């Protein structure tokens, strides 16, 4: 029994939702999202409450039930409050700047790294901290992971790009022979 799928999703007044066949349409004043659901899941929208039910009793239907419940909940949260991830850049000479539709990273390579900012993503740079904001949870996480992958933190000095809440397990360096 899916505990995630059982939840009833309350849709706030700032978000409008509608069901068209197997499609769920969500929109607020700025943007809209569409969720195509599988035919093994039944969608019910009544009084700004969204619920899902599995069509069959097999494991596949129950898996889709929880998955689409979580995806719809993420879209509603994204359109009402939004998602954000914070990255920190640590290292001597490592710099971050916001260019015209690009994020310019100086990470110790022989060339600067220019990352194009995708549509629907907003970035704020303060000193060596990057804040990524957006309404799509998957896209925000993917952009943060791609930026981190340019220079992941290394365990000896902790240099690199890391999530703000990430804990780097440090290693001791070599010890000299006696």
Curated annotation (Swiss-Prot):
Show the Pfam families listed in the entry: Ribosomal_L6
Q: Which InterPro entries match?
A: Ribosomal_uL6-like, Ribosomal_uL6-like_a/b-dom_sf, Ribosomal_uL6_a/b-dom, Ribosomal_uL6_bac-type, Ribosomal_uL6_CS
Statement: the UniProt record of this protein carries the keyword Ribonucleoprotein:
yes
Q: Which GO terms describe its cellular component?
A: cytosolic large ribosomal subunit
Q: Which GO terms describe its molecular function?
A: rRNA binding; structural constituent of ribosome
PROSITE patterns the record matches = RIBOSOMAL_L6_1 (PS00525)
Give the UniProt keywords, A-Z. Ribonucleoprotein, Ribosomal protein, RNA-binding, rRNA-binding
Task: List this protein's GO terms for biological process.
Answer: cytoplasmic translation
Asked if the Swiss-Prot or TrEMBL record annotates the protein with the keyword rRNA-binding, the reply is yes
Q: What is the annotated role of this protein in its UniProt record?
A: This protein binds to the 23S rRNA, and is important in its secondary structure. It is located near the subunit interface in the base of the L7/L12 stalk, and near the tRNA binding site of the peptidyltransferase center.
The Swiss-Prot or TrEMBL record describes its family as follows: Belongs to the universal ribosomal protein uL6 family.
Name the NCBIfam families on file: L6_bact
The UniProt subunit note reads as follows: Part of the 50S ribosomal subunit.
- Kindly provide the name given to this protein in its UniProt entry: Large ribosomal subunit protein uL6
What is the source species?
Answer: Helicobacter pylori (strain ATCC 700392 / 26695) (Campylobacter pylori)
Could you read off the lineage of the organism from its UniProt record?
Bacteria, Pseudomonadati, Campylobacterota, Epsilonproteobacteria, Campylobacterales
């Amino acid at each position: 029994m899916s505990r995630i799928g059982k939840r009833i999703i309350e849709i706030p007044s700032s978000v409008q939702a509608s069901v068209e066949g197997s499609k769920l349409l969500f929109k607020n004043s700025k943007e809209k999202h569409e969720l195509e659901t599988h035919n093994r899941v039944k969608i019910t929208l009544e009084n700004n409450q969204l619920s899902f039910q599995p069509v069959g009793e097999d494991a596949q239907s129950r898996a889709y039930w929880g998955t689409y419940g979580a995806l719809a909940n993420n879209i509603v949260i994204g359109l009402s409050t939004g998602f954000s991830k914070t990255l920190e850049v640590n290292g001597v000479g490592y710099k971050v700047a916001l260019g015209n539709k690009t994020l310019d990273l100086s990470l110790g390579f022989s060339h600067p790294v220019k990352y194009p900012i995708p549509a629907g993503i907003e970035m704020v740079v303060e000193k060596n901290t990057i804040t990524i904001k957006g309404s799509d949870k998957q896209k925000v996480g993917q952009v943060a992971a791609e930026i981190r992958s340019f220079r992941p933190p290394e365990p000896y000095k902790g240099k690199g790009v890391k999530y703000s809440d990430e804990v780097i397990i440090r290693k001791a360096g070599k010890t000299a022979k006696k």
